[in-house]
Amino acid sequence: MIRSVIRGVGSALPKKSLSNDEIAKFVETSDSWIVQRTGIRQRYIANENETTVSLGVEAARVALINANLTIKDIDCIILATSTPNHTFPASAVEIQHALGMSHGFAFDIQAVCSGFIFALTTGDAYLRSGVAKRILVIGSETFSRILDWKDRTTCVLFGDGAGAVVLEAQEIQSDVALECGILSAKLYSNGAYVNKLYVDGGPSTTQTTGYLRMEGREVFKYAVCMITDAVDDCFAAAGINSSQLDWFVPHQANKRIIEASAKKLGISMDKVIITVDQHGNTSAASVPLALTTAICDGRIKKGDLVMLEAMGGGFTWGAILIRW
Protein backbone atom coordinates (compact mmCIF):
# COMPACT_ATOMS: atom_id res chain seq x y z
CA MET A 1 0.00 0.00 0.00
CA ILE A 2 0.98 3.63 -0.52
CA ARG A 3 1.96 5.99 2.27
CA SER A 4 2.90 9.67 1.91
CA VAL A 5 6.39 10.48 3.16
CA ILE A 6 7.99 13.92 3.59
CA ARG A 7 11.21 13.69 1.59
CA GLY A 8 12.55 17.23 2.12
CA VAL A 9 11.74 20.51 3.88
CA GLY A 10 12.59 24.16 3.32
CA SER A 11 11.77 27.64 4.54
CA ALA A 12 12.22 31.29 3.65
CA LEU A 13 11.97 34.54 5.58
CA PRO A 14 12.04 38.17 4.45
CA LYS A 15 15.29 40.07 4.90
CA LYS A 16 13.92 42.53 7.47
CA SER A 17 12.98 41.61 11.03
CA LEU A 18 10.77 43.88 13.13
CA SER A 19 11.22 43.89 16.90
CA ASN A 20 8.61 44.68 19.53
CA ASP A 21 10.53 47.82 20.47
CA GLU A 22 10.30 49.03 16.87
CA ILE A 23 6.53 48.45 16.83
CA ALA A 24 6.24 50.38 20.11
CA LYS A 25 7.47 53.46 18.25
CA PHE A 26 4.23 53.74 16.24
CA VAL A 27 1.53 52.05 18.36
CA GLU A 28 0.87 52.19 22.09
CA THR A 29 2.52 48.98 23.28
CA SER A 30 5.79 47.68 24.70
CA ASP A 31 8.11 44.71 24.38
CA SER A 32 7.11 43.40 27.81
CA TRP A 33 3.37 43.72 27.03
CA ILE A 34 3.70 41.77 23.77
CA VAL A 35 5.99 39.07 25.18
CA GLN A 36 3.82 38.52 28.26
CA ARG A 37 0.61 38.11 26.24
CA THR A 38 1.87 36.37 23.10
CA GLY A 39 5.44 35.13 23.54
CA ILE A 40 6.42 37.02 20.38
CA ARG A 41 9.71 38.95 20.38
CA GLN A 42 10.09 39.70 16.68
CA ARG A 43 8.64 38.92 13.27
CA TYR A 44 9.79 39.29 9.65
CA ILE A 45 8.19 41.78 7.28
CA ALA A 46 8.38 41.53 3.49
CA ASN A 47 9.74 44.49 1.55
CA GLU A 48 8.10 45.72 -1.67
CA ASN A 49 10.09 43.21 -3.74
CA GLU A 50 9.27 40.23 -1.52
CA THR A 51 5.92 38.56 -2.11
CA THR A 52 3.99 35.43 -1.28
CA VAL A 53 5.21 33.99 -4.58
CA SER A 54 8.89 34.91 -4.16
CA LEU A 55 9.02 33.57 -0.61
CA GLY A 56 7.22 30.40 -1.70
CA VAL A 57 9.68 29.88 -4.55
CA GLU A 58 12.64 30.27 -2.19
CA ALA A 59 11.24 27.77 0.33
CA ALA A 60 10.37 25.31 -2.45
CA ARG A 61 13.90 25.42 -3.87
CA VAL A 62 15.38 24.62 -0.46
CA ALA A 63 12.95 21.73 0.01
CA LEU A 64 13.88 20.30 -3.39
CA ILE A 65 17.59 20.52 -2.59
CA ASN A 66 17.05 18.80 0.77
CA ALA A 67 15.03 16.09 -0.99
CA ASN A 68 17.82 15.63 -3.56
CA LEU A 69 15.28 16.21 -6.34
CA THR A 70 14.66 18.71 -9.13
CA ILE A 71 11.45 20.36 -10.26
CA LYS A 72 11.23 17.76 -13.05
CA ASP A 73 10.50 15.17 -10.36
CA ILE A 74 7.41 17.06 -9.11
CA ASP A 75 3.90 16.33 -10.44
CA CYS A 76 1.90 18.90 -8.51
CA ILE A 77 2.26 22.07 -6.43
CA ILE A 78 -0.25 22.93 -3.71
CA LEU A 79 0.08 26.38 -2.15
CA ALA A 80 -1.68 27.30 1.08
CA THR A 81 -2.10 31.06 1.35
CA SER A 82 -4.57 33.78 2.30
CA THR A 83 -2.41 36.51 0.76
CA PRO A 84 -2.00 35.61 -2.93
CA ASN A 85 -0.13 37.87 -5.31
CA HIS A 86 -3.33 38.31 -7.35
CA THR A 87 -7.02 37.57 -6.88
CA PHE A 88 -6.44 35.23 -9.81
CA PRO A 89 -4.67 33.31 -11.23
CA ALA A 90 -3.56 31.13 -8.33
CA SER A 91 -0.19 32.09 -6.90
CA ALA A 92 0.74 28.40 -7.16
CA VAL A 93 0.92 28.64 -10.96
CA GLU A 94 3.24 31.64 -10.62
CA ILE A 95 5.46 29.56 -8.35
CA GLN A 96 5.23 26.70 -10.85
CA HIS A 97 6.48 28.97 -13.64
CA ALA A 98 9.22 30.55 -11.51
CA LEU A 99 10.55 27.08 -10.68
CA GLY A 100 10.68 26.20 -14.38
CA MET A 101 7.86 23.66 -14.25
CA SER A 102 5.61 23.42 -17.32
CA HIS A 103 4.16 19.96 -16.66
CA GLY A 104 1.72 18.72 -14.03
CA PHE A 105 -0.62 21.10 -12.20
CA ALA A 106 -0.66 23.71 -9.44
CA PHE A 107 -3.36 25.37 -7.36
CA ASP A 108 -4.01 27.35 -4.17
CA ILE A 109 -5.83 26.32 -1.00
CA GLN A 110 -7.25 28.98 1.33
CA ALA A 111 -7.97 27.84 4.88
CA VAL A 112 -6.18 30.72 6.62
CA CYS A 113 -3.85 29.51 9.40
CA SER A 114 -4.98 25.90 8.88
CA GLY A 115 -4.03 26.11 5.21
CA PHE A 116 -0.87 24.03 5.36
CA ILE A 117 -2.65 21.23 7.25
CA PHE A 118 -5.43 21.24 4.63
CA ALA A 119 -2.88 21.33 1.78
CA LEU A 120 -0.78 18.49 3.22
CA THR A 121 -3.89 16.36 3.74
CA THR A 122 -4.97 17.04 0.14
CA GLY A 123 -1.52 16.08 -1.11
CA ASP A 124 -1.64 12.88 0.93
CA ALA A 125 -4.97 11.94 -0.70
CA TYR A 126 -3.57 12.63 -4.18
CA LEU A 127 -0.57 10.39 -3.56
CA ARG A 128 -2.56 7.52 -2.08
CA SER A 129 -5.07 7.66 -4.95
CA GLY A 130 -2.35 7.69 -7.62
CA VAL A 131 -3.08 11.19 -8.95
CA ALA A 132 0.57 12.16 -8.36
CA LYS A 133 3.83 10.62 -7.14
CA ARG A 134 5.57 13.70 -5.75
CA ILE A 135 4.01 16.95 -4.60
CA LEU A 136 5.42 20.27 -3.42
CA VAL A 137 3.25 21.49 -0.54
CA ILE A 138 3.92 25.12 0.35
CA GLY A 139 2.61 27.55 2.95
CA SER A 140 3.51 31.15 2.10
CA GLU A 141 2.11 34.39 3.49
CA THR A 142 2.60 38.15 3.51
CA PHE A 143 0.12 39.04 6.24
CA SER A 144 1.85 42.39 6.74
CA ARG A 145 -0.05 43.52 3.63
CA ILE A 146 -3.45 43.05 5.31
CA LEU A 147 -2.67 44.40 8.78
CA ASP A 148 -4.01 47.64 10.19
CA TRP A 149 -0.75 48.98 11.59
CA LYS A 150 -2.70 51.30 13.91
CA ASP A 151 -4.44 48.37 15.61
CA ARG A 152 -2.13 47.15 18.37
CA THR A 153 -4.31 44.09 19.05
CA THR A 154 -3.46 42.58 15.65
CA CYS A 155 -0.39 44.26 14.15
CA VAL A 156 1.89 42.88 16.88
CA LEU A 157 0.89 39.28 16.18
CA PHE A 158 1.64 38.54 12.55
CA GLY A 159 4.66 38.16 10.30
CA ASP A 160 5.62 37.02 6.81
CA GLY A 161 7.38 33.87 5.64
CA ALA A 162 7.15 30.56 3.82
CA GLY A 163 7.73 26.87 4.40
CA ALA A 164 7.62 23.92 2.03
CA VAL A 165 7.81 20.14 1.98
CA VAL A 166 8.27 17.56 -0.76
CA LEU A 167 5.67 14.84 -0.27
CA GLU A 168 6.41 11.50 -1.96
CA ALA A 169 4.41 8.30 -2.42
CA GLN A 170 6.19 5.25 -1.05
CA GLU A 171 5.15 1.61 -1.00
CA ILE A 172 5.03 0.09 2.47
CA GLN A 173 4.75 -3.56 3.46
CA SER A 174 1.85 -3.16 5.86
CA ASP A 175 -0.26 -0.43 7.42
CA VAL A 176 1.66 -0.32 10.68
CA ALA A 177 2.44 2.72 12.79
CA LEU A 178 6.18 2.00 12.70
CA GLU A 179 6.36 2.66 8.94
CA CYS A 180 7.33 6.27 8.12
CA GLY A 181 4.85 8.70 6.59
CA ILE A 182 1.46 10.24 7.30
CA LEU A 183 -0.46 7.96 9.67
CA SER A 184 -3.68 9.95 10.05
CA ALA A 185 -5.21 13.35 9.32
CA LYS A 186 -8.35 15.13 10.47
CA LEU A 187 -9.86 18.34 9.05
CA TYR A 188 -12.77 20.45 10.32
CA SER A 189 -14.52 23.78 9.72
CA ASN A 190 -17.48 25.72 11.10
CA GLY A 191 -18.62 28.92 9.40
CA ALA A 192 -20.63 30.02 12.43
CA TYR A 193 -17.49 31.75 13.70
CA VAL A 194 -16.63 33.82 10.61
CA ASN A 195 -16.89 37.13 12.49
CA LYS A 196 -14.33 36.08 15.12
CA LEU A 197 -11.35 36.25 12.74
CA TYR A 198 -11.66 37.70 9.24
CA VAL A 199 -10.56 40.35 6.75
CA ASP A 200 -13.08 43.17 6.33
CA GLY A 201 -12.85 43.39 2.56
CA GLY A 202 -12.92 41.42 -0.67
CA PRO A 203 -13.49 41.70 -4.43
CA SER A 204 -17.15 40.58 -4.24
CA THR A 205 -18.15 42.83 -1.33
CA THR A 206 -16.16 45.98 -0.65
CA GLN A 207 -13.98 45.66 -3.77
CA THR A 208 -11.01 46.40 -1.50
CA THR A 209 -8.38 44.24 0.15
CA GLY A 210 -9.46 45.13 3.68
CA TYR A 211 -7.72 44.59 7.00
CA LEU A 212 -7.50 41.66 9.39
CA ARG A 213 -9.96 41.87 12.30
CA MET A 214 -10.00 39.56 15.30
CA GLU A 215 -11.81 38.97 18.58
CA GLY A 216 -8.74 37.69 20.39
CA ARG A 217 -10.36 36.39 23.57
CA GLU A 218 -13.03 34.51 21.61
CA VAL A 219 -10.44 32.95 19.31
CA PHE A 220 -8.39 31.79 22.31
CA LYS A 221 -11.46 30.26 23.96
CA TYR A 222 -12.38 28.17 20.94
CA ALA A 223 -8.84 27.42 19.73
CA VAL A 224 -7.74 25.27 22.66
CA CYS A 225 -10.83 23.04 22.54
CA MET A 226 -10.82 22.68 18.75
CA ILE A 227 -7.10 21.98 18.54
CA THR A 228 -7.10 19.35 21.28
CA ASP A 229 -10.16 17.59 19.85
CA ALA A 230 -8.52 17.34 16.41
CA VAL A 231 -5.28 16.01 17.91
CA ASP A 232 -7.16 13.41 19.98
CA ASP A 233 -9.09 12.34 16.87
CA CYS A 234 -5.80 11.92 14.97
CA PHE A 235 -4.33 9.72 17.69
CA ALA A 236 -7.50 7.61 17.77
CA ALA A 237 -7.56 7.19 13.98
CA ALA A 238 -3.98 5.91 14.02
CA GLY A 239 -4.53 3.70 17.07
CA ILE A 240 -1.71 5.45 18.90
CA ASN A 241 -1.56 6.75 22.46
CA SER A 242 -0.48 10.35 23.04
CA SER A 243 2.21 9.13 25.45
CA GLN A 244 4.09 7.75 22.42
CA LEU A 245 4.45 11.20 20.85
CA ASP A 246 7.98 12.53 20.36
CA TRP A 247 7.23 16.02 19.04
CA PHE A 248 4.26 18.38 18.92
CA VAL A 249 4.47 21.01 16.14
CA PRO A 250 1.54 23.40 16.68
CA HIS A 251 0.44 26.40 14.69
CA GLN A 252 2.54 29.29 16.01
CA ALA A 253 -0.25 31.74 16.81
CA ASN A 254 0.35 32.62 20.43
CA LYS A 255 2.46 31.02 23.14
CA ARG A 256 -0.48 31.01 25.56
CA ILE A 257 -2.61 28.98 23.14
CA ILE A 258 0.28 26.57 22.55
CA GLU A 259 0.88 26.08 26.27
CA ALA A 260 -2.82 25.67 27.08
CA SER A 261 -3.28 23.13 24.27
CA ALA A 262 -0.22 21.11 25.31
CA LYS A 263 -1.40 21.09 28.93
CA LYS A 264 -4.88 19.88 28.00
CA LEU A 265 -3.38 17.14 25.82
CA GLY A 266 -0.94 16.09 28.54
CA ILE A 267 2.07 16.85 26.34
CA SER A 268 5.21 18.05 28.13
CA MET A 269 6.48 21.43 26.92
CA ASP A 270 9.90 19.92 26.25
CA LYS A 271 8.23 18.04 23.37
CA VAL A 272 6.69 21.20 21.90
CA ILE A 273 8.35 23.04 19.00
CA ILE A 274 8.04 26.81 19.51
CA THR A 275 9.15 29.40 16.95
CA VAL A 276 6.45 32.03 17.53
CA ASP A 277 8.96 34.10 19.51
CA GLN A 278 11.07 34.61 16.39
CA HIS A 279 8.50 34.50 13.57
CA GLY A 280 5.21 35.68 15.05
CA ASN A 281 2.07 34.21 13.51
CA THR A 282 2.82 33.51 9.84
CA SER A 283 -0.56 31.87 9.19
CA ALA A 284 -0.25 29.01 6.66
CA ALA A 285 3.55 29.27 6.75
CA SER A 286 3.70 28.75 10.50
CA VAL A 287 3.66 24.94 10.72
CA PRO A 288 6.16 24.26 7.90
CA LEU A 289 8.46 26.99 9.25
CA ALA A 290 8.43 25.39 12.71
CA LEU A 291 8.80 21.90 11.23
CA THR A 292 11.79 22.93 9.11
CA THR A 293 13.43 24.61 12.11
CA ALA A 294 13.13 21.46 14.25
CA ILE A 295 14.42 19.18 11.50
CA CYS A 296 17.37 21.40 10.60
CA ASP A 297 18.47 21.80 14.23
CA GLY A 298 18.35 18.03 14.72
CA ARG A 299 15.49 17.74 17.18
CA ILE A 300 13.18 15.75 14.90
CA LYS A 301 14.89 12.52 13.83
CA LYS A 302 14.02 9.51 11.71
CA GLY A 303 11.47 7.30 13.43
CA ASP A 304 10.06 10.10 15.62
CA LEU A 305 6.30 10.42 16.01
CA VAL A 306 5.28 13.99 15.15
CA MET A 307 1.91 15.73 15.48
CA LEU A 308 1.14 18.83 13.41
CA GLU A 309 -1.92 20.99 14.13
CA ALA A 310 -3.43 24.33 13.23
CA MET A 311 -6.55 26.43 13.67
CA GLY A 312 -7.54 29.48 11.65
CA GLY A 313 -10.30 31.83 10.57
CA GLY A 314 -13.63 30.36 9.56
CA PHE A 315 -13.09 28.59 11.85
CA THR A 316 -10.96 25.91 10.21
CA TRP A 317 -8.83 23.44 12.13
CA GLY A 318 -7.08 20.11 11.79
CA ALA A 319 -4.19 17.84 12.70
CA ILE A 320 -1.83 15.38 11.03
CA LEU A 321 0.13 12.57 12.68
CA ILE A 322 3.41 11.59 11.00
CA ARG A 323 6.03 8.94 11.59
CA TRP A 324 9.23 10.69 10.53
Swiss-Prot record:
Residues 252-256 are annotated as: ACP-binding. Pfam families: ACP_syn_III (PF08545), ACP_syn_III_C (PF08541). Keywords: Acyltransferase, Cytoplasm, Fatty acid biosynthesis, Fatty acid metabolism, Lipid biosynthesis, Lipid metabolism, Multifunctional enzyme, Transferase. The active site is at 113, 251, 281. Pathway: Lipid metabolism; fatty acid biosynthesis. SUPFAM superfamilies: Thiolase-like (SSF53901). Homodimer. Belongs to the thiolase-like superfamily. FabH family. This is Beta-ketoacyl-[acyl-carrier-protein] synthase III. It comes from Bartonella quintana (strain Toulouse). The lineage of its organism: Bacteria, Pseudomonadati, Pseudomonadota, Alphaproteobacteria, Hyphomicrobiales.
